[in-house]
């Protein structure tokens, strides 16, 4: 394996570094030969967008991706956004094209509620064709529900 060659030659163990790649991929090469530091994608996006400032000033956070499931806890955007939001005690709602049976695990990682944007069963192509309308409708309904809740509180 490439990672073993790096370890033997350079005395750098990239085998257990998240993001280095299976058995030493591109991430491992950049670390070993160029001294690169690996960062998660959400960490880079958070910094580039100044996400903390935006979240600090909001009432609640809406985030999403194509599918929210147990894999979402492994560095995907919704859980990364939720992590920032929870620093400021903001409620987080996730939306996705699909949810799986194991989606409940994301609640342990800061996502308070999750919703699928799909209104009917169809093909992947149909889901993509209706994506704008489906996301708009789901977001509007979530916002309306939040407004109802806020009005009922006084």
Segments predicted by a language model, with ranges:
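N-terminal loops that bind phosphate or other acidic moieties
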Residues: 1-154
């Amino acid at each position: 394996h490439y990672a073993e060659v790096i370890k033997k030659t350079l005395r750098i163990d990239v085998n257990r570094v998240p993001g280095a790649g299976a058995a030493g991929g591109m991430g491992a090469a950049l670390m070993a030969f160029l001294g690169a530091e690996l960062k998660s994608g959400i960490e880079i996006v958070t910094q580039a967008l100044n996400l903390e400032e935006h979240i600090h000033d909001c009432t609640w956070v809406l985030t999403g991706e194509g599918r929210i499931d147990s894999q979402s806890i492994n560095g995907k955007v919704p859980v990364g956004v939720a992590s920032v939001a929870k620093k400021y005690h903001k409620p987080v709602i996730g939306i996705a094209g699909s949810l799986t049976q194991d989606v409940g695990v994301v609640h342990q990682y800061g996502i308070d509620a999750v919703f699928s944007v799909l209104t009917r069963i169809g093909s992947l192509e149909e889901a993509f064709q209706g994506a704008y309308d489906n996301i708009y409708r789901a977001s509007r309904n979530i916002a309306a529900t939040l407004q109802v809740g806020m009005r009922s509180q006084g």
